[in-house]
C-alpha cells in the first residue's frame, strides 16, 4: 500500500489506477487505500443489494450522495437519503438494498482496511459471481455473510 505523506486531493472522477469493479451488480471505484482506511465510490443500480453480513474486524460507513439506500440492521430497515450517514460498527450485522427504482450513489469507507480491498479484487475477477463462491471467498477475507432472514 502506498500512503500519502501529506494532504491530498482525489478528483471526483479519479479511482486508484483507474480501477472499476463490478461487485454483485454494483460499480465500485476505489478512491483511497492505506492500512488504516479504505474508501470507494459506489453506484447501486435499481434492485441491487449487498446481502446481510458482518465485518468482525472493521467499522464501515456509507455516506449517501444521491438516491435512497436501505440499511437492514438485522432487525429492521432504515432508509438513507442524500446527506445521511450509515454507521455499521464492527461485528454488527447489516445488509444494503436499493429498492428505490433509481440508481443510488454513495461513498463507502472502512477502518481498518483489513482484507476488504483484496476481497473486491477477487470478486471482480470471478467468471461468475455465484452466491456460494462469493460467500466462500468473503470468509477468507474477514467478511461473514449471514443466512437469509426467515420469511
Residue ranges and their predicted role:
Residues 6, 108-129:
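A hydrophobic/aromatic-rich effector-binding and dimerization subdomain
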Residues 48-50, 67-72, 86:
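Short beta-strand segments in beta-sandwich/barrel cores
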Residues 57-69, 74:
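Glycine- and acidic-residue-biased ligand/ion/polar-headgroup-sensing regions
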Residues 70, 90-117:
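Ligand-binding loop in jelly-roll beta-barrel domains
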Residues 11, 75-93:
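Short acidic-glycine-tyrosine-enriched beta hairpin
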Residues 1-38, 124-151:
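A short, N-terminal "cap"/entry segment at the start of jelly-roll beta-barrel domains
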Residues 30, 39-43, 61, 77, ...:
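Conserved hydrophobic/aromatic beta-strand scaffold that supports enzyme active sites
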Residues 24-25, 40-55:
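Conserved short histidine dyad/triad with adjacent acidic residue
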Amino acid at each position: 500500500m502506498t500512503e500519502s505523506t501529506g494532504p491530498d486531493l482525489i478528483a471526483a472522477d479519479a479511482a486508484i489506477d483507474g480501477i472499476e469493479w463490478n461487485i454483485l451488480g454494483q460499480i465500485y471505484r476505489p478512491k483511497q487505500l492505506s492500512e488504516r482506511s479504505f474508501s470507494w465510490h459506489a453506484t447501486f443500480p435499481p434492485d441491487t443489494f449487498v446481502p446481510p453480513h458482518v465485518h468482525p474486524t472493521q467499522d464501515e460507513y456509507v455516506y449517501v450522495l444521491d438516491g435512497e439506500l436501505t440499511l437492514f440492521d438485522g432487525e429492521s430497515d432504515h432508509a438513507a437519503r442524500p446527506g445521511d450517514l450509515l454507521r455499521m460498527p464492527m461485528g454488527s450485522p447489516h445488509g444494503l438494498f436499493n429498492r428505490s427504482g433509481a440508481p443510488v450513489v454513495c461513498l463507502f469507507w472502512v477502518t481498518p482496511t483489513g482484507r476488504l480491498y483484496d476481497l473486491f479484487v477477487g470478486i471482480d475477477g470471478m467468471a461468475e459471481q455465484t452466491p456460494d463462491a462469493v460467500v466462500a471467498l468473503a470468509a477468507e477475507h474477514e467478511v461473514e455473510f449471514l443466512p437469509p432472514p426467515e420469511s
